[in-house]
Amino acid sequence: MNYIGSKYKLIPFIKENIHAVASNDLSGAIFCDLFAGTGIVGRAFKKAVHKIISNDLEYYSFVLNQNYIGNIQEIPNKEELINEVNSVALKKGFIYSHYSLGGSSRQYFSETNAQKIDAMRLKIEELKFSQNIDNCAYYFLLASLLESADKVANTASVYGAFLKRLKKSAQKELLLKGADFDLSSNANEVYQQDASELIEKISGDILYLDPPYNARQYGANYHLLNTIATYTPFVPKGRTGLPSYQKSSFCSRAKILNAFENLIKKARFKYIFLSYNNEGLMGETEIGNILKKYGAYSLITKTYMRFKADNKRAHKAAHTKECLHILIK
């Protein structure tokens, strides 16, 4: 999934420095990914640590992490399940009616793919409530649908707007592919809570923080993934069909510094790592001044290519600086 703030390309940098600071052997460690997103960082440490605690405010993220982090054993008959969901007949449901030209002025998906999403989503729910699948298989199928639907979405990566014409990838027919995950012998925990509240209930060894960098709320940028995941009817509003959504204090310039310091103050973890770039709402000095109050602070930086939701959009620079702020409490 092409995701704003994804750390996929930075995983080697993050892993190298976490191991260097904490330990090369993390087999007994509890690792918390508090702003998990698609779970890419937690997935990188899943086999290396004793337990992953994964959390995000958004439900689509909860679904992805229940699969990638929460699932630790092979799903029985997963190929048969994928084939069963792939074979369902088209259905004109909520996505078709509100997010394709077949039922609205919105063109997030082709008419065929919108019907496929509706049919597949309803089939997954049917399998769950008929008790033909357990929660592990349910989240595997639902995560597979989110990943597969995202590949044929008619957007410039985020769902804040749709494209006027169907791009080539959006013209391809949706095919459900399994969202495979790493197996593990250790049970993990997955939450969908406000980070400021969850931090009071958990503890561990390594806390990895990757909060939003700017004022764009993820609930708005990825609203359609939430809509597919929850599949709860509502009245879509405006040109983009945006539902009501939760707002993070980390996307507010007026609230972020206080929210960040409260998080650090309450954290019961020895090692804290914060990923943040040089264009975020918090400045490098502001972050450093807060972290220095609570222990030994250091900073490591890396220059890398910026994320572009729209390749045609002009930017001042092609690269951005990723900062890994490190605190040992």
Describe the residue ranges of each PLM region.
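A polyampholytic, Gly/Pro-enriched intrinsically disordered region
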Residues: 74-84, 210, 316-328
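Conserved proline-anchored active-site loop of SAM-dependent methyltransferases
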Residues: 31-45, 54-59, 201-221, 275
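Conserved SAM/SAH-binding loop
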Residues: 192-197
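S-adenosyl-L-methionine
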Residues: 1-34, 40-48, 63, 71, ...
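Class I S-adenosyl-L-methionine-dependent methyltransferase module
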Residues: 51, 57-182, 215, 219-253, ...
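Conserved Class I SAM-dependent methyltransferase catalytic core
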Residues: 250-298, 303
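Class I S-adenosyl-L-methionine
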Residues: 163, 284-329
